[in-house]
Amino acid sequence: APQANSFYVGAKAGD
């Protein structure tokens, strides 16, 4: 997942 979107993707993909 893009680290630039880690705040958003992290909640969904855990990355």
Curated annotation (Swiss-Prot):
Record remark on domains: The extracellular loops are most variable in sequence, and in some bacteria confer sensitivity to phage and/or colicins.
Family: Belongs to the outer membrane OOP (TC 1.B.6) superfamily. OmpA family.
Comment field (misc): On a 2D-gel the determined pI of this protein is: 5.5, its MW is: 32 kDa.
Protein name: Outer membrane protein P5
GO biological-process terms attached to the record: monoatomic ion transport
Keyword set includes Mitochondrion: no
Assembly behavior: Monomer and homodimer.
GO terms of molecular function: porin activity
Function text: Does not bind carcinoembryonic antigen (CEA). With TolR probably plays a role in maintaining the position of the peptidoglycan cell wall in the periplasm. Acts as a porin with low permeability that allows slow penetration of small solutes; an internal gate slows down solute passage.
Lineage: Bacteria, Pseudomonadati, Pseudomonadota, Gammaproteobacteria, Pasteurellales
Annotated Gene Ontology cellular component terms: cell outer membrane; pore complex
Taxonomic superkingdom: Bacteria
Membrane-topology annotation of the record: Multi-pass membrane protein
Record-annotated membrane-spanning stretches: 6-15
Keyword annotations from UniProtKB, A to Z: Cell outer membrane, Ion transport, Membrane, Porin, Transmembrane, Transmembrane beta strand, Transport
Subcellular location: Cell outer membrane
